[in-house]
From Swiss-Prot:
Belongs to the protease inhibitor I15 (antistasin) family. One of its GO terms (biological process) is negative regulation of coagulation. Inhibits mammalian elastases. This is Guamerin. It is found in: Secreted. SUPFAM superfamilies: Leech antihemostatic proteins. InterPro entries: Antistasin-like (IPR004094), Hirudin/antistatin (IPR011061), Prot_inh_I15_antistasin_leech (IPR008086). GO terms for molecular function: serine-type endopeptidase inhibitor activity. Not found in the saliva, but in the body tissues. It comes from Hirudo nipponia (Korean blood-sucking leech). Disulfide bonds join C12-C23, C17-C28, C30-C50, C35-C54, C39-C56. It holds the Pfam family Antistasin. The keyword Secreted applies.
Amino acid sequence: VDENAEDTHGLCGEKTCSPAQVCLNNECACTAIRCMIFCPNGFKVDENGCEYPCTCA
């Protein structure tokens, strides 16, 4: 198993990432996915400040 591979679900090191995050090198990081839809109130944001992809607030 490649420990540096990106994982989009499950445990990330010692914790679980939110749906707005990806696991990269055993660290939760904001996803780089950006959506071209207009959200009048912006995108939904998790407790870490990461935007949920294509999900309006």
